[in-house]
Curated annotation (Swiss-Prot):
Protein name: Chromatin-remodeling ATPase INO80
Compositional bias per record (Basic residues), positions renumbered to this chain: 1888-1899
Domain notes for this protein: The DBINO region is involved in binding to DNA.
Composition bias type Gly residues, residue spans: 1840-1850
Species annotation: Mycosarcoma maydis
Compositionally biased region (Low complexity): 321-334
Catalytic activity field: ATP + H2O = ADP + phosphate + H(+)
Major subcellular location class: nucleus
Gene that encodes the chain: INO80
Length: 1910
């Protein structure tokens, strides 16, 4: 595993020094920058493999490497980057063992031989020396033998952490697999490893303490580095390592690693320490684990230099035993480093001469000069595998220049530098010239003053004591007892010994290095020699194999010829009779298919098979080569090829099998030797065959003296038989065969001749075609020209046709536009005619009604100031009409009017018709009213006459009076419209029967209403709410009854909430009029209909009723009954209820038979102009008959202005006001009512609570802006409903989160049975059921378990078992009074709290031994007793204070508690106070509710005593009475109370639980939502809570309006919690309840709040007792809110009215209020002067504007606009590109037509590379296939067949019946690629085809002519 995988390795930040190939490790030379790149192991040895599963190197038999010190050429395999060093903690791997090496365990014998190079061992010595010198406790890398690594800087290595060790970190993931890890060898240590550890000890002792770990220092000079060991600070030690157990008091020693290594070396013996190689010590040391505490003191040091350990590790690692387990590795090898006798002299000589160092270094580069150098031979006790050094990568060494010009390697230079530096630090003990060293003096043991050295258990001279605790040291780093001058003689001698040992060790290192280098070079030379030899013989092997193959081929050919000759000779001899019997028999056997014993017997062939000789040759070759079993007989069919013969089941032997040498041959053996020595050669010749030997066949025939072969009779018979068989065979087999052959030959010749003839014919035709080519080309060209001309004229005709169509289309569009303009003008004239007619009618009526005078408001009077009457109208408007001039002109031309023609531009005729139609309308209205009056009078007369006849009276005079009165009242002369102001001058006084006094503006309203009635015109009384529209309507009915003697019937239709108000006010103000309330259920209404449904009823003063009051709902349901009656006046209160012209209510009321209609509304225009038209059409159907025309004239411009899309046309607004004024009267409060108090509106903004924010953000996150915009642009009803649903969800969040889900009561599931009663009414008001729950589970217990000795008799924790004997009761009881008394005498008594609570020892004993109920009773009695004495006990002046216990004493003390700032509560009340006031102690703080609860399981058994005991235990009457007290009936009984007092004198009648605190009661498991949480969760409710407190304190009365009834439910819970008195009125309230609630509110001042819904409680009712109105949420129709607030701000209100609006800031609530205020201004446009309008809520765009913020809406609209613009631009660009392509195409066509050469008779010749008539090449088949893809360039040279893939023999010139699908560029039109007889190209591929058509390619005449060449 790499360093990155293992953890956080320490990496060098600077440049890493290169790795050198001398020893596989890296050496650092200061100031040296090598240009040789470092390479990994695989780079140095690319032929070696890497086994990732074993995580080890797989060693080949031989490798290549540098030889003779010459660096090898850099290899080409750079599969791995250079390795990188990192540190690891050695303690991390103390439990791991060294990795096994199975490849060494199962390797061949020659690969398991130890190959230890002296050069490698010397490098290991030097590396171990460097590591030991820097830090004796830093072990080398355990896996240095696997990968080469780079050495760190000396100062970094010296100051590295002690427990760090270095491993190779590969940057390449392929070279460092993930499953690779660092293994730790097993902990093993032998005594011989530590026997030398105390040989040469200095004055200080070696211990387990480590040298201080210093931070990295900057690089110092060579001199400073070499001498820095004398100035290091050794005052600190690593505290992380434990001290040895057997060395507790040894002084600390400085961390000089060379001393430790010398001590280890000296402890191993003189001979072994001098001549031991340090190569193995570093490896052994890195696999050594730290010693345990159980080891001896000699084992404390583990990181010092130990050659024996190192060699043992190396030996154990390379052995088979080491790879098989740690047990075998512990004693795997024992290495004895001794000096060979013949090398002792050389070593001694080299020890005394320092100059020998350079000569040894030279030997590295010149091995020939180092032959005489002595070698250190290592004696192994056991054979091991190749050492680590043989596996390291080989790099060319970096050399340094010596003084004499020689070049040294980097390792030699460093060794030389270190030798010189060490020698320089020897204080003169070493000769400066490097000569012989002074012999070391005798070692003197230092006698320390404090700690004498104990005897060592090893063979060393002394054993140092363990280090003591840390002491202070002087600034030089040495301890004071050694650095003094008086102790210098003790350590000076050892210092001299150390210097001498350094020199000795340096020489040893040099000797080992030279020997290892020499051995390494020899080994490398041997490996290279074998490698080159293997490569050479591989080449020779191939050459020999090739020569053998050639020789075998020649030999085979020779043998085949020989065999063929032999067979021919045998046939001749046989025919001649010279063949012997033996030979004849052999031949017969061969012919029969038998096999002979010789070589030829292996083959079987027919006699006449021509290829038998080949088989014989193969058999002979196989027999001679020893591979007869490999021969496969190939039978050839007779007269047919071998592949067609089904009997040919054997294939021929491959030629390669015969060419390869036979296995086991000489050549094969020779080549196999190379294969065994060279594993890297993977030859294809796995097995070799021997070369065949020549075939030697001789024939021996017997001849006579004359040379003839003698033939006897037998021989003659044989020959005759042979001849017969031969001829028979020939006749039977060969003759048919020859016949077939002859036939086949004849047929083959025929076919061949035919083929020849066809070829000759084709060649002849080709020549003829070449001659006739000119004529053919002329014809083709003429045909092409004709076709192209035809295409041109077709295209021309098409273009002309398109131009004609385009001109016709433009003409039609122009005519259509002109017709539209004429129609628009016609419609404008028609609309102007209708408006003019309406204006004239309004002017005639208004002059009589005096509406302007009746209003008397600034708003109406100032209209002429704001709107300039002289302003010029726009193009779509007409000049103002002068009614007088128009009427005069109409009278003058009345008889000569032409028909109405709206196409005539002269509008004078239209104005005349408008005036006449207006006059006619007035006349018709008058006639209708007169007819109604006449009919009503006649009916009244008949009814009265019938009544008088019944009474016996004369009706004649009365009839005359009525007719006279009618003539006076309705004189036709008074209704002359030519003088419209004649009737408006009459002033009407207040009727006398009206009991109230009308105000001035109300009296003017009465005059206006009377004029409407007298003119027979309907009207709208649109006074602002609260100005007395109801009383004005009642006064009108009184006026008609008093003046005109019209007593009805009058129909008043009002909302259900105002029906009682109408009835009360009619009875109050006009008692003479009889009001009939018509509401109730079906039966009630049937009874009421008897009063007004009678046939003969006279509506006079004595009529059963005069006014019928009902609601809109009942009118619709009882429509048929209302239509039977002719109503004199129909008054609609709150007329906005019929604002929808499509509703059933509007249509039903429009069909009623009535003389006049009066609409009462405070908001004539609410949402749209359509509602205004609905009201106008209701009062004047003849004028406002078309809603489309009305909307065309007014609605569009006004609503577009409201949407801020344009400016309002002031002329249109003025004309609208002119039309409405005669029919509508509107006054506002501020202008007509001065005594009414002001109305103040205050907006209260609230922030969302935490819960509301969470819900609001969740809803916003689930909304897609794009989806909202799509829904806004669509007119889908489902989308609109979805948007409205979203709006409601957001409004719920703003109002209260509980509207989504109520926080209901949480309680566990109770698995129990509760008490039941038969009837609650029978039980009375009080039902006491304490302890009534029982378990639903009954467990039947056997008798054996319940009887004595059973399971239920086992003592429990509350059992009293054992107390009957007295021992537990007396001896072992601590609650005995004597024991308590004795314990109180002690200092820390257990019962010290008893005196504080006033309990004596006897009382404590009594309480302990009493039962639980007695304890409860005693505590309750004590509590009651002190409660009665509490007032006296707390005062010291009373005697009761002397007996109070200490726990109840009160001492005034200052405290920080806000509840009791100066009093410290008694001790006994601390817990109770915590339970009462701490939130954590309450039940509401419980976060977990049990899922289920149940009482104890009920046990049942057949044992009677057991059941009785269970019943007593669960139903103890005494316990029940004590806890719950007497029943309510028992408490009233004196006798029962006395019995309880006598039985339980300390128990009160109500029980002890009644007096207990609630926090002491058991937890019931039920969680009830806190009302405080209900208030806090909603910001509006929290703000309302504060506001209501202030209003309640100031004596205000409040109306609170809501939009949702569920919110009213939550508000009721809040009011109950705050204990406010309130009323509630919503749509579900009954009519009678509404009347009573309004009455109670007006008469009962103790009622504080009235909860109302905006729709139900805001219409018509009088709630002037309230002076404050609060809107909890808002309606987007501002009229509803205005009506709601006017319930309090109306006539009769004497206080100032304050309106509060609770608005949630930054939410949909705020946007609804803003939109409603915009809609509120619509009245100023319709009936006022402000130029602003409203918008309806039905538009999806407005709903989206509520859901989104302004920024989001603007951004989404901007993105949508940008997308539309981008799409439009893209379409324009596509159109421009298409037109541009078309122009370019036409241009290219014209250029091609101009540049193409004209045809000249017979000189035309169309070759493959020649241009056609228009200079383009025809498309090939490949082009046709790729026409829809990217165009590709076509080569000029193409095949005759018209395609790159056609064959050369394809036919040419054949004309196809179907034209080519590929068309010429002339066939393209508008960028589309069209083909003759083919479908159009797809639109998506037109661009590619278009680009393809532009390529100018040559076309053949055939393709231009539409022929297909194949």
């Amino acid at each position: 595993m790499s360093g990155e995988d293992r953890g956080a390795p320490y990496r060098y930040a600077g440049e890493r020094p290169p790795a050198y190939p001398a020893d596989g490790y890296a050496s650092y030379q200061r100031g040296l920058k090598s240009s040789i790149p470092s390479r990994s192991y695989d780079t140095a040895y690319p032929e070696q493999g890497y086994d990732r599963h074993l995580r080890e190197r797989v060693h080949p038999a031989y490798t290549t490497g540098p030889s003779y010190g010459v660096p090898p050429p850099p290899p080409t395999d750079y599969r791995r980057p250079p390795p990188q060093a990192a540190y690891r903690y050695e303690e991390d791997y103390h439990h791991r063992r060294a990795p096994a090496q199975p490849h060494l365990e199962y390797a061949p014998e020659h690969r398991r031989q130890p190959v230890h190079s002296d050069a490698y061992r010397e490098a290991d010595d030097r590396r171990s020396f460097e590591q030991a010198r820097s830090d004796p406790y830093a072990s080398p890398s355990r896996h240095a033998y696997q990968d080469s690594y780079r050495s760190e800087l000396p100062h970094e290595r010296r100051h590295a952490p002690a427990a760090y060790e270095r491993i190779s970190v590969r940057d390449d993931a392929r070279s460092a697999p993930e499953n690779r890890h660092i293994d730790e060898p097993a902990v093993y240590r032998r005594d011989e490893y530590d026997a030398h550890s105390r040989e040469i000890q200095p004055s200080y002792r070696r211990g387990a303490h480590r040298s201080p770990r210093l931070s990295p220092q900057p690089v110092v000079s060579a001199h400073e580095r070499s001498s820095e060991y004398a100035t290091r600070d050794y005052s600190a030690s690593a505290a992380r390592y434990a001290e040895p157990v057997h060395q507790p008091e040894s002084p600390p020693r400085p961390s000089m690693s060379i001393f430790n290594m010398l001590n280890d070396r000296s402890a191993n013996g003189a001979v072994e320490s001098v001549h031991s190689s340090p190569t193995k010590s570093s490896i052994a040391a890195e696999h050594e684990s730290y010693p345990t505490t159980a080891q001896e003191p000699s084992h404390a040091s583990r990181a010092a230099f130990d050659p024996a350990r190192e060699q043992s590790y190396s030996t154990a690692r390379d052995s088979q035993a080491y790879s098989r387990g740690s047990e075998a590795r512990a004693g795997a090898a024992r290495v004895n480093y001794t000096v060979h006798p013949e090398d002792e002299a050389a070593i001694s000589q080299r020890r005394n001469s320092s100059a020998h160092q350079q000569s040894s270094i030279k030997s590295v580069r010149h091995p020939a000069n180092a032959v005489d150098e002595p070698l250190i031979r290592v004696k192994h006790e056991e054979a091991t595998s190749a050492s680590l050094d043989a596996q390291m990568s080989a790099e060319p060494p970096v050399s340094h220049t010596l003084n004499n010009g020689e070049r040294l390697s980097a390792q030699d230079a460093k060794v030389a530098t270190e030798d010189s530096s060490l020698a320089a630090n020897g204080n003169g003990k070493v000769d400066s010239a490097g000569g012989t060293a002074r012999p070391a003096p005798a070692k003197t043991q230092l006698k320390l003053r404090n700690n004498p050295l104990p005897a060592s258990k090893s063979n060393s001279s002394f054993v140092a004591p363990p280090p003591p605790a840390k002491k202070n040291r002087d600034p030089d780093g040495w301890e004071s007892d050694l650095s003094n001058e008086e102790n210098q003689p003790f350590w000076q001698t050892e210092l001299d010994d150390y210097i001498f040992d350094v020199r000795e060790r340096q020489r040893l290192i040099e000797d080992a290095f030279v020997a290892s280098m020499r051995e390494k070079h020899v080994e490398v030379e041997r490996r290279l020699a074998r490698a080159y030899e293997g490569r050479y013989f591989a080449v020779i092997r191939q050459i020999r194999l090739r020569e053998q193959q050639e020789a075998s081929q020649r030999d085979m050919e020779r043998r085949q010829d020989h065999v063929r000759q032999q067979r021919d000779h045998e046939i001749d001899l046989e025919l001649l009779g010279t063949l012997s019997d033996g030979q004849q028999n052999m031949g017969t056997r061969k012919k029969k298919g038998g096999r002979g014993t010789d070589d030829d017997g292996l083959l079987q062939a027919d006699d006449d098979d021509d290829d038998d000789s080949d088989d014989v040759a193969l058999a002979d070759l196989a027999a001679r080569n020893g591979s007869k079993s490999n021969i496969i007989k190939l039978k050839r069919s007779k007269g047919k090829p071998a592949a067609a013969d089904p009997r040919n089941k054997k294939r021929r032997l491959e030629n390669g099998a015969a060419l390869s040498p036979a296995p086991g041959s000489e050549v094969d053996s020779t080549l196999a030797d190379f294969g065994g020595n060279f594993d890297g050669d993977d030859s294809a010749f796995a097995s070799h065959q021997a070369s065949p030997t020549p075939d030697d066949v001789s024939f021996a025939l017997d001849v006579d003296a004359s040379g003839k072969v003698p033939i006897d009779a037998r021989r003659a018979q044989q020959l005759e038989d042979a001849h017969r068989r031969i001829w028979t065979t020939i006749a039977k087999r060969d003759v048919p065969k020859v016949y077939r052959t002859v036939l086949q030959s004849a047929s083959s010749k025929t076919m061949y001749w035919r083929r020849i003839s066809s070829v000759v014919q084709r060649e002849a035709k080709r020549g003829a075609a070449r001659n006739n080519k000119t004529v053919k080309d002329v014809q083709l060209r003429a045909r092409k020209v004709m076709r192209e001309v035809l295409v041109f004229w077709k295209r021309n005709e098409k273009e002309e046709r398109e131009l004609r169509k385009k001109a016709e289309r433009e003409a039609l569009e122009k005519a259509k536009k002109e017709e539209e303009m004429r129609e628009a003008k016609r419609q404008a004239r028609k609309l102007n005619f209708l408006i003019s007619q309406t204006e004239l009618y309004s002017h005639f009526v208004g002059s009589k009604l005096k509406t302007a005078e009746a209003e008397e408001s600034e708003e109406t009077a100032g209209s002429s100031k704001i709107i300039d009457p002289n302003a010029q109208p726009s193009d779509a408007t007409v000049l103002p009409i002068n009614p007088h001039s128009e009427l005069a002109d109409a009278e003058a031309r009345l008889a000569e009017l032409d028909d109405i023609d709206f196409d005539d531009e002269d509008e004078s005729n239209l104005r005349a018709h408008a005036a006449r139609n207006a006059q006619e309308a007035v006349r018709l209205a008058k006639e209708k009213a007169q007819a109604f009056d006449v009919a009503a009078a006649e009916e009244r007369r008949r009814n009265e006459a019938a009544a008088r006849e019944r009474e016996g009276l004369d009706a004649g005079p009365v009839k005359q009076i009525e007719e006279k009165d009618l003539g006076k009242a309705f004189d036709s002369d008074d209704m002359n419209f030519l003088n419209p102001t004649s009737m408006g001058q009459t002033e009407i006084k207040q009727p006398k029967m009206l009991t109230c006094q009308l105000k001035e503006y109300q009296l003017k309203g009465l005059n206006w209403l009377a004029n409407l009635y007298e003119q027979g015109i309907n009207g709208i009384l649109a006074d602002e709410m609260g100005l007395g529209k109801t009383v004005q309507s009642i006064s009108l009915m009184a006026y008609l009854a008093e003046v005109h003697d019209i007593w009805g019937p009058f129909l008043v239709i009002a909302p259900a909430s105002t029906l009682h108000n109408w009835q009360q006010e009619i009875s109050k103000f006009v008692p003479t009029l009889k009001a009939l309330p018509y509401w109730g259920n079906v039966k009630d209404r049937a009874v009421l209909r008897k009063f007004w449904n009678r046939k003969q009823i006279s509506y006079n003063r004595d009529a059963p009723f005069h006014v019928l009051v009902t609601s809109y709902q009942l009118v619709v349901s009882d429509e048929k009954y209302f239509q039977r009656v002719k109503w004199q006046y129909m008054i609609l209160d709150e007329a906005q209820a019929i604002k929808s012209s499509s509703s059933i209510r509007w249509k039903t009321l429009l069909g009623f038979n009535c003389r006049n209609r009066l609409l009462l509304t405070g908001t004539p225009v609410q949402n749209s102009m359509q509602e205004l038209w609905a009201l106008l059409h209701f009062i004047m159907p003849s004028l406002f008959d078309s809603h489309d025309e009305f909307s065309e004239w007014f609605s569009k411009d006004i609503e577009s202005h409201a949407e801020q899309k344009g400016t309002l046309n002031e002329h249109q607004l003025r004309r609208l006001h002119m039309i409405l004024k005669p029919f509508m009267l509107r006054r506002i409060k501020k202008n007509v009512q001065n005594e009414l108090g002001d109305k103040i509106e205050i907006d209260v903004f609230c922030d969302l609570s935490a819960r509301q924010k969470m819900l609001y953000r969740g809803l916003r996150a689930n909304i897609s802006v794009a989806e909202l915009m799509d829904r806004a642009t669509s007119n889908d009803e489902a989308g609109l409903k979805s948007l409205m649903n979203l709006v409601m969800q957001f409004r719920k969040v703003c109002n209260h989160p509980e509207l989504f889900e109520r926080a209901d009561v949480r309680a566990p599931f109770a698995l129990a049975d509760f008490a039941r009663s038969g009837s609650l009414a029978r039980e009375g008001d009080l039902l006491n059921l304490p302890d009534s729950t029982t378990s639903l589970i009954e467990l039947q217990v056997p008798k054996l378990l319940v009887r004595e000795g059973g399971i239920f008799d086992i003592p429990g924790h509350n059992s009293r078992k054992g107390f009957d004997t007295g021992y537990l009761q007396n001896l072992f009881n601590i609650w005995r009074a004597p024991h308590i008394h004795e314990s109180l005498q002690e200092e820390r008594s257990t019962f010290a709290s008893l005196p504080l609570i006033g309990v004596s020892p006897s009382e404590a004993q009594k309480t302990f031994h009493s039962t639980g109920i007695k304890r409860i009773l005693a505590a309750a009695a004590e509590e009651r007793h002190w409660r009665s004495l509490e007032a006296f006990a707390s005062d010291d002046t009373f005697a009761a204070a002397s007996v109070r216990p200490l726990a109840k004493m009160l001492r005034p003390m200052p405290t920080t508690s806000g509840r009791s700032p100066s009093v410290l509560m008694p001790l006994e009340e601390v817990a109770a106070d915590y339970r009462r006031h701490s939130y954590l102690a309450k039940d509401s703080a419980r976060a977990v509710v049990a899922p289920a609860v149940a009482p104890p399981i009920k046990l049942y058994s057949n044992d009677g005593p057991f059941m009785q005991a269970q019943e007593r235990f669960s139903r103890d009457a005494q316990v029940s009475v004590t806890l719950f007290g007497l029943s309510p009936e028992g408490r009233e009984s004196v006798k029962r109370v006395e019995e309880l007092q006598s039985e339980l004198p300390e128990v009160p009648p109500q029980g002890v639980m009644r007096d207990s605190s609630i926090d002491q009661l058991p937890y019931n498991g039920m969680q009830v939502p806190q009302m405080n949480k209900l208030i806090v969760d909603s910001s509006k409710l929290a703000k309302l809570d504060v506001l209501l407190r202030e209003l309640k304190a100031n004596g205000h009365r409040v109306l609170i309006y809501f939009q949702m009834t569920r919110m009213i439910d939550l508000m009721e819970e809040y009011l109950i919690y705050r204990q406010y008195k309130y009323l509630r009125l919503d749509g579900a309230s009954k009519i009678s309840d509404r009347r009573d609630m309004v009455t109670d509110w007006q008469t009962k001042p103790e009622l504080f709040i009235f909860l109302l819904s905006t729709r139900a409680g805001g219409l018509g009712i009088n709630l002037t007792a309230a002076d404050t109105v609060i809107f909890y949420d808002h309606d987007w129709n501002p009229s509803n809110d205005s009506q709601a607030m006017d319930r309090a701000h109306r006539l009769g209100q004497t206080k100032q009215v304050t309106v509060y609006r609770l608005i949630t800031k930054g939410t949909i609530d705020e946007r609804i209020v803003r939109l409603a205020r915009n809609k509120k201004e619509v009245q100023d446009i319709v009936v006022g002067t402000k130029a602003y309008s409203e918008t309806g809520m039905a538009k999806p765009q407005e709903i989206v504007s509520l859901l989104l913020d302004d920024d989001e809406l603007a951004e989404s609209m901007l993105r949508k606009k940008q997308a539309e613009e981008a799409q439009t631009a893209q379409e324009k660009a596509d159109l421009a590109r298409a037109s541009h392509a078309k122009r370019r195409l036409n241009k290219d066509r014209a250029a091609a037509a101009v540049e193409s050469p004209a045809p000249v008779g017979s000189t035309w010749s169309l070759e493959d590379d020649e241009d056609d008539f228009f200079g383009a090449r025809p498309p090939s088949k490949a082009d046709t296939d790729t026409a829809e893809t990217t165009p590709q360039l076509q080569s000029k040279k193409r095949s005759v067949g018209g395609g790159g893939g056609g064959s050369g023999g394809a036919k040419r010139g054949r004309i196809s019946e179907v034209a080519s699908p590929r068309m010429t560029p002339l066939s393209l039109d508008d960028g589309a690629l069209m083909a003759s007889g083919e479908q159009l190209a797809s639109p998506s591929k037109g661009a590619a085809a278009k680009r393809k058509s532009k390529s100018h390619r040559k076309k053949t005449v055939d393709e231009l002519a539409g022929v297909d060449l194949d």
